[in-house]
Amino acid sequence: MKKGLFITVEGIEGAGKTTNLNFIRSILEESGEEVVMTREPGGTPMAEEVRELLLRPREEAVSSTAELLLMFAARAQHLEQKIKPTIERGVHVLSDRFTDATYAYQGGGRGLSWAMIQDLEKLVQAGFKPDLTLLLRIDPETGMARARKRGALDRFEREKLEFYFCVQEGYMKRVAEDPERFLVVDAQQSLEEVQAAIAQGLAAKLAG
């Protein structure tokens, strides 16, 4: 049986990930493909509990290293219980964030060692990575203005603007390391232009 594709969507807050995740799902389903949607951190009952720990605003300062380890703990569970079994069945998995977000947020935003993240990635993933990653790139000021309109902010959304410029740099460093895997789209274009670029990139991946 042919394995399903593992497709991830990345970007800072306000980049339009939810809208475009649903757009990708509709393209795949209209072509007769089965798709499972998931997210990180989260994706399984245990991993969702870790997500709540990570995102809930709290008075206690959270160690950046603790944050990183929790991300990979949730990812280990997510991979073994959901992502890998699903693609083995020939079903595509579409995820709102994956390991690139860890490099961007904990590496770029928090300033943690890239090498430390790489070591954890090797331990947890053993070479496993997405087949295609869509990175929606948006100016952090624009993205955060959009995010604030959605209502209550989680612990990450409360970070200062400078944090998101560092996150964006982290994402672009990841693109430079593995350019063939990424489809980078300017999310400040009109929705029609963004989705035309996504559709073209997805079609090329499916054809390959």
Swiss-Prot record:
Similarity comment text for this entry: Belongs to the thymidylate kinase family.
Taxonomic lineage from the root: Bacteria, Pseudomonadati, Pseudomonadota, Gammaproteobacteria, Oceanospirillales
Keyword Kinase: yes
Keywords: ATP-binding, Kinase, Nucleotide biosynthesis, Nucleotide-binding, Transferase
Protein's job: Phosphorylation of dTMP to form dTDP in both de novo and salvage pathways of dTTP synthesis.
EC assignment: 2.7.4.9
Keyword set includes Heme: no
GO molecular function terms listed in the Swiss-Prot or TrEMBL record: ATP binding; dTMP kinase activity
Name of protein: Thymidylate kinase
UniProt xrefs under HAMAP family: Thymidylate_kinase
GO biological process, one term: dTTP biosynthetic process
Reactions this protein catalyses: dTMP + ATP = dTDP + ADP
Enzyme class: transferase
Residues that coordinate or bind ATP: 11-18
Originating gene: tmk
Pfam family, one: Thymidylate_kin
InterPro entries: P-loop_NTPase (IPR027417), Thymidylate_kin-like_dom (IPR039430), Thymidylate_kinase (IPR018094)
Segment forming the signal sequence: none
GO cellular component: a single term: cytosol
